[in-house]
Amino acid sequence: CSFLFCIPLAFYYQFANGYLTQVGLKNATGWMSLGQFSEIFFMLALPFFLRRYGIKKVLLLGLVTAAVRYGFFMVGGTENMLMVTLLFVGILLHGASYDFYFITASIYTDEKSPSHMRTSAQGLITLITMGLGALVGNQLGGATLEHYTLTVAQGNETFNWFGVWGFGASIIVFVTILFVFFFKENEEYSKNAGVNVFH
C-alpha cells in the first residue's frame, strides 16, 4: 500500500505549485510552506492519535486526509472565500497525510522488524516508497498532465485540474480500500505499539 500510495502522492509535489498559481493564488510557493509547518503540528499530535486510535486507524486517517486534500483541490479556487479556504485547508492537510501515514508506517516497520534488521527494513521501505513509488508517480503524473492538457486555455488555466486531482484522488481511494481489507493488526497491539515508541 505504501508503494501504491506514493504514486498519487507524487502529484502533490509535481503539480501543487503550478495549480495554485494557475487558479490565481498569489505567492503559491510561500503559501505551500504552510504544509511543512503543519507537519510539525501533526508530528507533535501523533503520539496522542496513536495512543487513542492505534496504528491501523492512524494509517487510515493518513490515506483519507490525502484523498480529501485532492478533493478540495478539485473544487478550490479564488472566486470566493469558501473556495480559497478549501485551497488552504488542502495545503494544511499535507502535514496530516504525511505524518499520519509515513511516520506511522515507519513506527510500524520498526516495531515489526527484529532489532538487528530495523535499519535494513527502514531502508527497504524508503527505497520502495520514496524511490520506486515516487518514480512511478512522476511518470504517471506526466502522462496524466498531458492527458488533461486543455486545447484552449481557460483564463490562466492550461490544464483540467479537476480531472488531474480527481484521478489522483481515485487512486488514493483505491489504495484505501485495499488497506482496509488487507491490513490486519490486533487492535490491542496496534495501540500498545504506539505507546511503546513514545516512552
Positions of PLM-derived features:
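Multi-pass alpha-helical transporter architecture, strongest
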Residues: 161-199
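Helix-loop boundary and gating motifs at the non-cytosolic
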Residues: 1, 5-33, 102-103, 138
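Intracellular juxtamembrane helix-capping segments at the cytosolic ends
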Residues: 100-114
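Loop-to-transmembrane helix entry/capping segments in MFS-fold secondary transporters
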Residues: 26, 113-126
